[in-house]
């Protein structure tokens, strides 16, 4: 089902993901702790869990916690600017700051992160196969997709990036809209409008139907990894429930409309689930509105619409 090579491959992917993360220093610290002592014995323990579904998972699950990270901070300088006062100063500090918005970052033992990464490799790759070409953010890399379908548990993943390069896809998303607008103006002589918008509080307004994902696994997943995929999906659902239980005392205050929703910030799987959650929205935009250009990068959306001269 799961071998040492597969676990180490998932760990290397996670380690690479942590390296390029800009704000998740908790994950970076967990990576350092995990491989500092008895690395192979810890890997063996994860393999044994997949072989027997033992009680280790419950111990790991109970260690899931949440760190509150400031997302938006205001000071009296910001208030004065919004009030219409022209206030120029090279003093960038204030005596008091007010935290206006926070993010709830999941923290967990490395074993939990590895299970999450394995879900991304095997289940996430299957979901990503059906995403629209209009989706640019957090797409699974071709090497990871290939690995998930090879069913060779003796091999390790050579490439270590779960997702395609951020900067490449971001540039394609942004430039695609601009280039399409130029093309419509020059070729068709029509006026165009470029609309840019973002989805507010996106991750906290997502509800994941894991039963629906189970049904997709049953219908579309390769037979050789179907049982593994269902097992991973079951465990990820429990991890999501634990995360929501942890944030529930706070989220009713900060995001009252999202008390029963939300996916963990800090999991690789959450990036994939966010794309899956909007898959029908992406298809409806293309089929029902059919703008000259539609592109979505996570929660940032670009439309290009033309108007007949």
Indicate residue ranges for each PLM-predicted region:
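Conserved polymerase palm-domain catalytic core
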Residues: 181-298, 302-309
């Amino acid at each position: 089902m799961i071998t040492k090579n597969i676990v180490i491959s998932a760990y290397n992917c996670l380690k690479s993901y942590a390296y390029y993360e800009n704000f998740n220093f908790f994950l970076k610290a967990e990576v350092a702790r995990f491989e500092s002592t008895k690395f192979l014995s810890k890997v063996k323990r994860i393999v044994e869990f997949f072989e027997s579904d033992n009680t280790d998972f419950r111990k790991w699950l109970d260690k899931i916690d949440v760190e509150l990270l400031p997302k938006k901070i205001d000071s009296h300088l910001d208030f004065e600017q919004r009030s219409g006062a022209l206030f120029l100063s090279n003093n960038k500090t204030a005596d008091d700051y007010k935290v206006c918005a926070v993010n709830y970052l999941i923290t967990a033992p490395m074993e939990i992160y590895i299970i999450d990464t394995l879900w991304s490799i095997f289940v996430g790759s299957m979901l990503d196969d059906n995403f629209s070409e209009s989706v640019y953010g957090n797409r699974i890399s071709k090497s990871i997709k290939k690995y998930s379908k090879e069913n060779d548990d003796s091999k390790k993943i050579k490439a270590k990036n779960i997702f395609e390069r951020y900067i490449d896809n971001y540039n394609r998303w942004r430039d695609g809209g601009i280039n399409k607008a130029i093309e419509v103006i020059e070729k068709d002589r029509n006026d165009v409008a470029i609309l840019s918008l973002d989805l507010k509080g996106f991750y906290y307004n997502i509800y994941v139907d894991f039963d629906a994902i189970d049904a997709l696994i049953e219908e579309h997943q390769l037979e050789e990894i179907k049982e593994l995929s269902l097992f991973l999906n079951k465990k990820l659902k429990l991890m999501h429930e634990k995360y929501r239980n942890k944030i529930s005392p706070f989220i009713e205050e900060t995001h009252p409309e999202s008390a029963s929703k939300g996916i963990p910030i800090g999991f690789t799987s959450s990036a994939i689930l966010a794309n899956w959650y909007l898959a029908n929205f992406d298809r409806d935009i293309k089929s029902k509105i059919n703008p000259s250009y539609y592109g979505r990068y996570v929660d940032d959306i670009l439309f290009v619409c033309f108007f007949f001269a």
